Amino acid sequence: MKQLCCSCLLWLGLLLAPFSQEQEEVTSPTKLCGRDLLVEVIKLCGQNDWSRFSMEEQSPMTELVPQYTRKVKTFNPHRSSSSWGRFTNPGVSQKKATHTWESQSLPNYQLKKEELLPKTGVHSYHGGKPYVKSVKFQKKNTDKMSTFSGLFWGNHPQRKRRGFADKCCAIGCSKEELAVACLPFVDF
């Protein structure tokens, strides 16, 4: 009886071993540099099974910019005439629609005139004092940006310069981190 129980546990362990290696493979960071990194990203982005990655929950783009969550429709001239509805009369055939383009009127955008510097005559060297305030304001804004960058990256100038590829080469990247490279190709 004891021998039967041990053999069952051994078989169970052998059956679960491939699954545990697969989970470990997903979470463990691997150092990838240059061509190896590119090949791994291509393999990952080319997979049809995205169920292992819950990108909708972890996607920084959908959290920061909510309009990325909507579907984007692309224009394909080989579709039925319903996709041509914006540019043509729906009663016209597709062949005729390609030769006669009846465009609808475009929306009128209200453009805001940009605040330009006041037009004056010749400025002397001392007459440029109003512009000193704008330069100080610009300097203050750039200081705020560098403060934000410092909070995000910390006080490490190397981290600020290090890109995604350098990080994967020096430290290593897991498959979840590599999946970020596929975001431009994912249809949300």
UniProtKB/Swiss-Prot annotation:
Its main location: secreted. InterPro entries: Insulin-like, Insulin-like_pep_6, Insulin-like_sf, Insulin_CS, Repro_Hormone_Insulin-like. Residues 1-22 form the signal peptide. GO terms for biological process: apoptotic process; ectopic germ cell programmed cell death; fertilization; flagellated sperm motility; male gonad development; negative regulation of apoptotic process; negative regulation of developmental process; negative regulation of reproductive process. Transmembrane segments: none annotated. The keyword Signal applies. Disulfide bonds join C33-C169, C45-C182, C168-C173. The keyword Disulfide bond applies. Keywords: Cleavage on pair of basic residues, Disulfide bond, Hormone, Secreted, Signal. This is Insulin-like peptide INSL6. PROSITE patterns: INSULIN. Testis and prostate specific. Pfam families: Insulin. GO terms for molecular function: hormone activity. Belongs to the insulin family. It comes from the Eukaryota. It is found in: Secreted. GO terms for cellular component: extracellular region. May have a role in sperm development and fertilization. Residues 53-158 form a propeptide.
